[in-house]
Regions:
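Conserved protein kinase catalytic core
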Residues: 21-23, 139
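N-terminal accessory regions of nucleic-acid-interacting proteins
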Residues: 1-16, 21
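Metal-dependent phosphoesterase signature
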Residues: 68-88
């Protein structure tokens, strides 16, 4: 029996960037803390309704390795919102639409959000929401193994836009994969160039927080 997916009218797509260390220097049980949040409310066809982005202060220092990878400095993070304020801002953005479904590229963002909220004694602003693992679902649609976002864009013949490993840029690239993924579940060839070239354009509207 073919699986039938019913898409919500809108989905909140989120990407988180975390503090990080080189593997050789990383202590045991190290947990990268959230330092940047990117989010967008989108339709299944890839229309971006609203966008949100903020830097977040963290207890962990921003290492040189982290700055090289993310392009985020300690000064950037020091100028960000306190974690509780960032969660409040995300909660307010999340309630702008009636859907209670959010997605990310993989499960790491879900785990990171829950971990950091628990660390600060806060309830996740997305507690009780359905989480969509877009990385897993996108790979399933094409009957391939799960890959990173950048590799998925290459497979889908979609150009990477904006700096990789910046939260909002990654969100907008995930939106393209999200919009391109679902027709493949309905018997479209997994490498149909006409479909990929005819993907919906991203419509950027104002209205999200900074």
């Amino acid at each position: 029996m073919r699986e039938i997916l019913i898409e919500p009218v809108e989905v909140l797509i989120i990407d988180l960037e975390n503090t990080c260390m080189h593997e050789a220097e990383r202590p045991e049980n190290y947990h990268g803390q959230i330092i940047e949040i990117g989010a967008a409310w989108v339709t299944p066809t890839g229309e971006v309704l609203e966008k949100f982005s903020t830097l977040v202060q963290a207890e962990n220092p921003v290492t040189e390795f982290c700055t090289e990878l993310l392009g985020i400095t300690q000064a950037d993070v020091d100028g960000g919102l306190l974690f509780a304020d960032a969660m409040q801002a995300l909660a307010e953005f999340a309630t702008r639409h009636s859907s209670r479904t959010w997605g990310s590229w993989g499960a790491a963002d879900l785990k990171s959000l829950n971990h950091d909220c628990a660390h600060h004694g806060l309830e996740s602003p997305l507690a009780g929401w359905e989480h969509r693992n877009i990385k897993k679902e996108w790979a399933k649609a094409r009957k391939i193994k799960q890959v990173g976002m950048k590799k998925a864009l290459e497979i889908a013949r979609i150009d990477l836009e904006g700096p990789h490993h910046r939260a909002l840029s990654d969100v907008l690239n995930i939106v393209k994969l999200y919009a391109a993924g679902w027709p493949a579940l309905h018997n479209l060839p997994k490498a149909d160039p006409d479909f990929m070239q005819g993907r919906p354009e991203i419509i950027e509207l104002t209205g999200g927080a900074r």
